[in-house]
Regions:
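Intrinsically disordered, low-structural-confidence terminal and linker regions
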Residues: 1-2
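Active-site-flanking segments in enzyme catalytic domains
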Residues: 5-196
Length: 196
């Protein structure tokens, strides 16, 4: 059962592009060479993955990005179909008590993660660089400040990625595709937490 569309999609997209948070993130993308990649900050992820066809109409279905009993809400997503990074305010500030500075810091870290997916999709990471990063995430242990459980279990960024993304195998992708996702997610998390 799809949710009834309760938002004005075009309006939400425009607000997501022009919010004070998005403007700060835009500066980061520009500085990192991703001037053509869009960024939208909204309550929910508004990417093509949450749009479904129902009875010949396009419907908004945020169920796959919202928090469940097993998993937290999706914080961000790079949509390669539209070349836009979508970030969720509901995921970074679920109780509504964070200050603007705290929200911006959280969004910046998520942007760092999602930028890796954009760089990879645009083939802006060379094979040598990717091979280096792949080896790095398979050998670098996760710091305690990033994930206490991963630290206790002496996980690398790669083994942590396999654990926290274990549901990927059920989606029907080939073993090679799932492995690539594990590696790319590990690299994205390494970049996100590089200052820890």
């Amino acid at each position: 059962q799809l949710e009834e569309q309760t938002i004005n999609f075009a309006e939400a997209m425009e607000e997501g592009r022009t919010s004070k948070f998005a403007k700060e993130l835009r500066k980061i993308l520009n500085a990192r060479g991703l001037k053509d990649t869009g960024v939208i900050v909204s309550n929910d992820i508004l990417s093509t993955t949450v749009l479904k066809e129902q009875d010949g109409q396009i419907a908004f279905d945020p169920r796959i990005t919202r928090a469940t009993t097993e998993e937290g809400a999706v914080e961000g997503e790079y949509d390669k179909n539209t070349d836009i990074i979508f970030l969720s305010l509901n995921a970074v500030n679920p109780d509504g008590n964070a200050t603007d500075a705290e929200i911006q810091t959280r969004l910046n870290k998520i942007l760092d993660h999602e930028m890796i997916h954009a760089l990879r999709a645009k083939d802006l990471i060379t094979e040598n660089e990717y091979r280096y990063l792949k080896n790095l995430v398979k050998n670098r242990r996760v710091p305690q400040a990033v994930d206490a459980q991963a630290f206790e279990q002496k996980e690398t960024f790669y083994t942590r990625s396999k654990r926290i993304n274990s549901g990927l195998a059920k989606l029907g992708a080939s073993a090679n595709k799932v492995e690539e996702i594990y590696i790319e997610e590990a690299i994205a998390e390494l970049f996100r937490t590089r200052e820890v």
